[in-house]
Amino acid sequence: MRHYELMVILDPSLDERTVAPSLDTFLNVVRQDGGKIDKVDVWGKRRLAYEILKHSEGIYAVIDISATPATVAELDRQLGLNESVLRTKVLRHNK
């Protein structure tokens, strides 16, 4: 298992209280494949450096994950298919 940090920028029209539960549905992919969610940190609504899909703000969430590369690729694919997700970025930690 490798350690990853996933940053997700969500549509600012979403209610911030529902961000963590909605992300949890995607994170079930990691749990089903034997991975572990170390931390979910919702930063809230922040201004973007440049517009993404005509949005100047986004709701940021940072998630620390321990999983296999295939599991993280599947998670990133599923997040990319969701219309409320503006952008994702996956980084591998060297712990």
Curated annotation (Swiss-Prot):
Molecular function terms, GO-annotated: small ribosomal subunit rRNA binding; structural constituent of ribosome
GO CC term (a single one): ribosome
Keywords: Ribonucleoprotein, Ribosomal protein, RNA-binding, rRNA-binding
Purpose: Binds together with bS18 to 16S ribosomal RNA.
Species annotation: Rhodococcus opacus (strain B4)
Domain of life of the source: Bacteria
Entry's family note: Belongs to the bacterial ribosomal protein bS6 family.
Upper taxonomic lineage: Bacteria, Bacillati, Actinomycetota, Actinomycetes, Mycobacteriales
Name of the protein this chain belongs to: Small ribosomal subunit protein bS6
InterPro entries for this protein: Ribosomal_bS6 (IPR000529), Ribosomal_bS6_sf (IPR035980), Ribosomal_S6_plastid/chlpt (IPR020814), Transl_elong_EF1B/ribsomal_bS6 (IPR014717)
GO BP annotation list: translation
